[in-house]
Amino acid sequence: MTTVGENSPTTQITIRYPLSAIRCPLTSVLCFLSFFIFLAGCGYTTRSTLPKSIKTIHVEPFKNSINYIEGTGRNIYFPLLEVNVRNAVINRFLFDGNLKTAEPALADLVLKGELTNYNRAALRYTDNDDVQEYRVQITVSLVLSNTQTGETAWTEPAFTGEATYFVSGPTASTEDAAVVEATADLARRIVERTIEDW
């Protein structure tokens, strides 16, 4: 409350500030701080548990061993799928930043991969029993070797990346687009497996 005196000591003007005028600056400050705390939490990074001596990795060319004749599901040949998977893994390592890619002679780790299966399966049907959504899966076997010790760090006989796509409706997509997404999902999982499980 503020009191302002006029010429006579008996005249007083009282100015009352509404409670909302006091709360407004406090609310603004709290919103501002909350926003920056939120932004600080948005920068997700994968925490590496790699030993300090492990700094580089070489990703060998993937071998394509998918049986396109006798496989289960829908084994369609996608040209250069093994090349695309390897490139996606290398790019994911570059994006992650915990390991640098290197030539085999300079690498602390060597990752070998082999495509073992591609599958497309119906996931959801319409009321007329038409397929509405499919899931595609790319499965690989992996071996990670530590060149410093000469030992195998880990093996994964069936490591899978997957994606889904709708064949109709406003979000309709194609199998080719889903393969790209499944490849990216597989690469992300491979990198996480490599840098986290030590």
Named regions from a protein language model:
Residues 1-22:
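N-terminal secretory signal peptides that target proteins for export/translocation
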Residues 18-19, 25-26, 33:
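Short polybasic linear motifs
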Residues 28-41:
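Bacterial N-terminal signal peptides
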Residues 41-90, 98, 148, 192-198:
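A structural "domain/chain start" motif
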Residues 59-62, 93, 113, 140, ...:
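Buried hydrophobic packing residues in well-ordered domains
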Residues 73, 77-85, 103, 132-136, ...:
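Extracytoplasmic/periplasmic, Sec-exported soluble proteins
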Residues 96-154, 161-173:
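Surface-exposed short loop/turn segments
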Residues 175-198:
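Compositionally biased, intrinsically disordered linkers/stalks adjacent to structured regions
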